[in-house]
Amino acid sequence: CLLSRGLGDVYKRQGYDMIGIDQSEEMLCVVRDKAEQLGLSGRLLLLRQDLLKLDLYGTIRAAVSTFDTFNHIPDLDTAIANAGFFMEKGGVFLFDMNTPYKHQKVLGDNAFTFEEEDASCVWRNHYNAADRKVEITVDIDYHETGEHFHEEFCEYTYDLATIRAALEKHGFALESVCDGETFGPLTEESQRYFFCATKQYTQLEE
């Protein structure tokens, strides 16, 4: 999220105007509250949109995407094309993604249980090799209220060559890719990519 405490304070000092995008109205409300706490409301536009149908009404100079957003999108090529369409020449695109290693070897067909004082969580995974995606089921029980939360979603697996090709196809130069947890060089067991790409030309003329 662009408005995590550290990033929000940095953007506030630098005077950036920001656009926050999510399909969830609930998440946008959380960001709106955070923006008010940081005094950023006047420089923040929140849009409820699908990244596959993006319309920003103008150009941008940078984009930041975290928490594996692009793994949740079945059409990576279109999502990157949309980001590129609205970005000015020289614009910076920063984003992270889970690696094939994490999907296949760490999540795989494994289940994880987490116990906290106020809640317990069971996270189940199934790797669908034919469709190259992880099918994930999350169940959370809140001890005090007895409330139960259930969610099912997929993460799609994209290898480095596919991501690089999509970036280059849509006008980006891949400046660097590193381990998204250590920020050191990638290894065979890296679980997260972190990408820095720059746009080579402007497509949308205002």
Predicted feature locations:
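A short His-aromatic
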Residues: N71-H72
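Single conserved hydrophobic/aromatic residue that forms the stacking wall/gate
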Residues: C1-G8
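A short acidic, Gly/Pro-enriched loop at the edge of an enzyme's catalytic core
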Residues: L52-A63
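A short, glycine/Asx- and small/polar-enriched loop/turn
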Residues: I60, R132-V134, E188-Y193
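C-terminal lobe and adjacent flexible extensions of AdoMet/dcAdoMet transferase-like proteins
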Residues: Y158-E206
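Class I SAM-dependent methyltransferase SAM/SAH-binding core
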Residues: D9-K53
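SAM-dependent methyltransferase
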Residues: L94-A166
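A short glycine-rich, Lys/Arg-flanked "PGG" loop and its adjoining helix->strand segment in the class I
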Residues: D77-V92
